[in-house]
């Protein structure tokens, strides 16, 4: 019986783009438009070296009162102020042995099957990284205008009314919010309150949940805090389109295979360099030990500083309890 090796079925030139494309198709962050890229961010990520930060200058809005025109006074030129956002290139990788992929190797299209499993893995990892970043971002007082914490109040449960309160933390920019990320327990509570509608995608035919016309992303890696009295405090996040800047970098060797002769194992190695950045909150590197941040360092508020006006940051943190 012929033995199929990983190196026999993996063609890196085909495998790499397949994994990248499939990862974005599997992730609700990408499908809902929360994570979006642009030419500038892509170019910066491609040029960046290991662990490099990416500087993204921007122009502040023009402000000040208009000047009255008359025959005697000249207009006084006002300053146009610039600011700078900063993202970090995240470097990650993993390896899997032929034992892990044995069933997949025996299929009719093993490369696509393996690629789908690797893409699903990275979709989960990138979602986990986003929530680590948000934990760090919202641990700072400079994000107070984008936070609503009702968990300590008598009526601090997730409901239609409290959700509206959270949405309007952005004031007249509320309409920019297009999705909400929540724990499955929060989702269950919302379903029981008859707050969830399921909409069928016109292209894929897949039904996905929505709440007040906002797409729902359910993830059990969302924070849950248990207080001393046993009360659980849940964290949900509201997002706008493009709230996260996304770009793929260029690892020197994104995919390779290896052979462990002593263990009779083939090994698939996959590496990713990428940016997933909450736009408008600068990564400062103040508490980063290595060349690229760990999940714990991403969750450290010392590494983040708000630079955009609060209403321009299309993310709101909502802390609440659930209906008994």
Swiss-Prot record:
Keyword Nuclease: no
Family the UniProt entry places it in: Belongs to the lambda phage major capsid protein family.
Pfam family, one: Gp13-like
GO cellular component, one term: viral capsid
Name assigned to this protein: Major capsid protein
Record keyword Zinc present: no
Annotated organism of origin: Bacillus phage SPP1
Intracellular or extracellular location(s): Virion
Chief localisation class: virion
Subunit annotation: Interacts with the scaffolding protein gp11. Interacts with the decoration protein gp12.
Keyword entries, A-Z: Capsid protein, T=7 icosahedral capsid protein, Virion
Protein's job: Capsid protein self-assembles, with the help of the scaffolding protein gp11, to form an icosahedral capsid with a T=7 symmetry, about 61 nm in diameter. The capsid encapsulates the genomic DNA.
InterPro entries referenced in this protein's UniProt entry, alphabetically: Gp13-like
